[in-house]
């Protein structure tokens, strides 16, 4: 079976990691082809897997009508040339243009939603545009199926009437397990870690304002890169917490960094089902996160971590203070999170559920045996 995967940007993010886990998890019965808008992290890693990688330069994130039309035409040509059995799109922009192109070529198409473009927290004009585009895509293409990475996203789509329930399936993100590298309680002073790109969505500002009121010794490690990095660094100096904060940049040793930390935080304004939280749970870390998107489907209040409202400086501070002050609490919540990861969010579970979605479109005889032994 041949699958064409389409995504807009190749940057290092949750959607890209999810896509790599899919492409690396299929047996030799699957031939994967990747189409993305530029060279970057994703194309480099895909080529290491032996994936046929195509750059479609017109496939860009900003809305540009002429360029978007060219991207649509380019994807149609690519579909005709590669003759995939399924087109599988990731991210909102690729999800719209890719579905249009696949349906025009009469190829079954899957769209994985890594958070809707009309999520709460996104600016009103973009929410309206995202909602209209999803209504449009749902109506022009009948031979499609939508994968939501969280039940919350599926419920939101039903509420907004963008897709019928029978055309959607929740497949939680899953990642490969790795051995615990070290005791999460080895740090002195304790290390708080956040792994996220420096974008408005991740709201590093709230986290910095929260730690400005914390007492005692601790370190905050911020892993990632992005356009707001310098702005966040300046805010850390303005708040007088720069000595507590380490900006580590984009890293390829995140499991090691998590193994040396004592607790994980994610202060996002909106999310789908964050892979970064799964990585923290895999490492046995308790999690403090904002209650957005599908976050509460992995962070169980008082069991695997604590939930706060978006932009709730005091709430983040209280949760961090409780965990910093109590090593036994960190161990209990982190251990429960680790067990939940093993039980529910492994890579194989994700692959099996994704294969079942493919089977709905092309038949079980085409998808039997496509999941590798992982």
Predicted region positions:
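Membrane-proximal helix-turn-helix segments that form the acceptor-binding/catalytic region
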Residues: 73, 127-146
């Amino acid at each position: 079976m041949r699958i064409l995967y389409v995504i807009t940007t190749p940057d290092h993010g949750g959607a890209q990691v999810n896509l790599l886990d899919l492409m690396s998890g299929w047996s030799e019965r699957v031939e994967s082809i990747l189409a993305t808008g530029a060279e970057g992290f994703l194309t480099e890693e895909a080529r290491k897997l032996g994936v046929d990688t195509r750059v479609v330069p017109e496939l860009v994130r900003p809305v540009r009508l002429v360029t978007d039309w060219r991207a649509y035409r380019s994807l149609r040509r690519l579909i005709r040339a590669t003759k995939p059995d399924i087109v599988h799109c990731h991210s909102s922009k690729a999800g719209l243009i890719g579905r249009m192109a696949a349906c025009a070529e009469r190829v079954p198409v899957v769209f994985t939603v890594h958070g809707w473009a009309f999520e709460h927290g996104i600016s009103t004009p973009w929410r309206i545009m995202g909602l209209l585009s999803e209504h449009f895509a749902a109506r022009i293409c009948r031979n499609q199926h939508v994968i939501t990475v969280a039940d919350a996203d599926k419920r939101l789509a039903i509420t907004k009437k963008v897709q019928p329930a029978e055309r959607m399936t929740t497949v939680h993100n899953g990642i490969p397990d790795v051995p615990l590298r070290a005791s999460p309680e080895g740090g002195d002073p304790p290390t708080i870690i956040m792994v996220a790109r420096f974008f408005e969505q991740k709201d590093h500002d709230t986290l910095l304002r929260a730690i400005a009121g914390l007492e005692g010794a601790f370190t905050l490690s911020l892993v990632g890169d992005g356009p707001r990095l310098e702005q966040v660094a300046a805010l850390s100096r303005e708040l007088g917490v720069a000595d507590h904060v380490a900006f580590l940049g984009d890293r390829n040793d995140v499991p090691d960094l998590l193994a040396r930390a004592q607790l994980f935080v994610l202060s996002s304004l909106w999310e789908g089902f964050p892979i970064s939280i799964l990585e923290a749970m895999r490492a046995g870390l308790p999690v403090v996160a904002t209650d957005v998107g599908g976050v509460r489907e992995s962070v169980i209040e008082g069991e695997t971590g604590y939930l706060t409202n978006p932009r709730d400086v005091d709430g983040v501070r209280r949760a961090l203070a409780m965990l910093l002050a109590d090593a036994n609490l960190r161990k209990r919540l982190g251990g429960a999170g680790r067990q939940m990861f093993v039980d529910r969010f492994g890579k194989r579970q994700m692959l099996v559920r994704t294969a079942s979605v493919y089977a709905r479109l092309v038949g079980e005889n085409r998808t039997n045996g496509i999941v590798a032994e992982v």
